[in-house]
């Protein structure tokens, strides 16, 4: 299983969290899409934006994104195999930690019980509960 940048952009149509976000939005400067591959079979996908502040909604995410932000914001993740979502988040965070000047790993998550259980069971802490989202933080020492 290996981490790659996503090149098959048709896969973003499968995004259950933010299907309305375009490829242009997801690949703008300061944003990246990664996938977890096993034998050329995509197991999970994550979209990341870099900021210097914690965004509370998509509008702030768009405004705050910059190429060299110190915060990696995971704003959508989905998987095609059991356990792949967890591995996707942790492997991506590890890759970013080792290759970019990022100090914090934050999510911009929907206010759902599924998102809450997913992030808390993977070691994240609830950072803040917003009107339209919840931010979870993955402690650096976990990564």
What is each of the regions a protein language model found here?
Residues 1-69, 78, 100-103, 134-143:
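Non-catalytic substrate-recognition and accessory regions of acyl/acetyltransferase enzymes
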Residues 58-123:
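Acyl-donor binding region in acyl/amide transferases
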Residues 30-31, 123-125:
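Short glycine-aromatic motifs
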Residues 125-137:
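Conserved catalytic-core motifs of GNAT/GCN5-like acyltransferases
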């Amino acid at each position: 299983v290996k981490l790659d940048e996503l090149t098959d952009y048709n896969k973003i149509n499968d995004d259950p969290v933010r299907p309305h976000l375009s490829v242009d939005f997801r690949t703008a400067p300061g944003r990246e899409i990664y996938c977890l591959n096993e034998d050329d079979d995509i197991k999970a996908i994550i979209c990341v934006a870099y900021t210097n502040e914690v965004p509370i909604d998509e509008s702030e995410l768009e405004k705050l994104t910059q190429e060299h932000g110190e915060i990696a914001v995971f704003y959508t993740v989905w998987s095609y195999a059991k356990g792949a979502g967890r591995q996707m988040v942790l492997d991506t965070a590890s890759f970013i930690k080792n290759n970019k000047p990022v100090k914090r790993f934050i999510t911009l998550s929907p206010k759902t019980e599924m998102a809450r259980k997913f992030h808390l069971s993977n070691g994240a802490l609830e950072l803040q509960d917003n009107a339209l989202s919840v931010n979870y933080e993955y402690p650096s020492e976990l990564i």
